């Protein structure tokens, strides 16, 4: 058996020592007395091979049987004691798969996504033969998409997605001067018109900045 990398303090009570005159064995420094001790290789091998499992205090060994035991323990260990390398790998693969699903969902969405659940405004655009997106000149419309939750691809509930009916700005803010309008004689009509015009101006500015 070749040299060991061991924690002598953990096993010194279980392993017999040879005489210091012997040339065989691996030299280990005793930190308390600062004298050289010679560990019996046969006794040490018997100690390791007789253990049901190899713990961190046993350190590592070049012995094939001990290596096999370490590998076996790393695979079948539980969460309360040792960490399984296989478990870590499976967890990382699961996280990467979820990240891929999120990116795919975001890339496939053409209306914009609000992960916190918000309103995203977008202009109406048409696709030409040159595969370029150009703004429609005939009508500028506003669509509000309210997104709540996340995609079912992530294993959760489906997003609630309500699409507001598209209306032209001119139709949305046209004056209610018709004969059948109940607001015509309202005492608050003047304040309402000022507020409505201000809202229209803000909305147009928002659209132009997009």
Curated annotation (Swiss-Prot):
Residues 129-138 have a biased composition (Basic and acidic residues). It comes from the Viruses. GO terms for molecular function: ATP hydrolysis activity; magnesium ion binding; nucleotide binding; RNA binding. It is found in: Host cytoplasm. InterPro entries: Rotavirus_A/C_NSP5 (IPR002512). Signal peptide: none annotated. One of its GO terms (cellular component) is host cell cytoplasm. Keywords: Glycoprotein, Host cytoplasm, Magnesium, Metal-binding, Nucleotide-binding, RNA-binding. O-glycosylated. One of its GO terms (biological process) is viral genome replication. Its cofactor is Mg(2+). Residues 119-141 are annotated as: Disordered. Mg(2+) binds at residue 86. Belongs to the rotavirus NSP5 family. Homodimer. Interacts with VP1. Interacts with VP2. Interacts with NSP2 and NSP6. Plays an essential role in the viral genome replication. Participates, together with NSP2, in the formation of viral factories (viroplasms) which are large inclusions in the host cytoplasm where replication intermediates are assembled and viral RNA replication takes place. Orchestrates the recruitment of viroplasmic proteins such as capsid proteins to these factories. This is Non-structural protein 5. It comes from Rotavirus C (strain RVC/Pig/United States/Cowden/1980).
């Amino acid at each position: 058996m070749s040299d060991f990398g061991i924690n002598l303090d953990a096993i010194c009570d279980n392993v017999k020592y040879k005489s210091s005159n012997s040339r065989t064995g691996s030299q280990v420094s005793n930190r308390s007395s600062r004298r050289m001790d010679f560990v019996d290789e046969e006794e040490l091998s018997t100690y390791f091979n007789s253990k049901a499992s190899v713990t961190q205090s046993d350190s590592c060994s070049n012995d094939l049987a001990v290596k096999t035991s370490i590998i076996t323990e790393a695979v079948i260990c539980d969460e309360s004691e040792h960490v399984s390398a296989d478990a870590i790998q499976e967890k990382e693969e699961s996280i990467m798969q979820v990240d891929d699903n999120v990116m795919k969902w975001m890339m496939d969405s053409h209306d914009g996504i609000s992960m916190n659940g918000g309103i995203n405004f977008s202009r109406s655009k048409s696709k030409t033969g040159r595969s370029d997106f150009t703004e429609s000149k005939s009508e500028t419309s506003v669509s509000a998409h309210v997104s709540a939750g996340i995609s079912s691809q992530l294993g959760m509930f489906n997003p609630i997605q309500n699409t507001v009916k598209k209306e032209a700005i001119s139709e949305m803010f046209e004056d209610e001067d018709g004969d059948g309008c109940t607001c015509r004689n309202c005492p608050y009509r003047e304040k309402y018109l000022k507020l409505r015009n201000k809202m229209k101006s803000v909305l147009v500015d928002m659209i132009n900045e997009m």
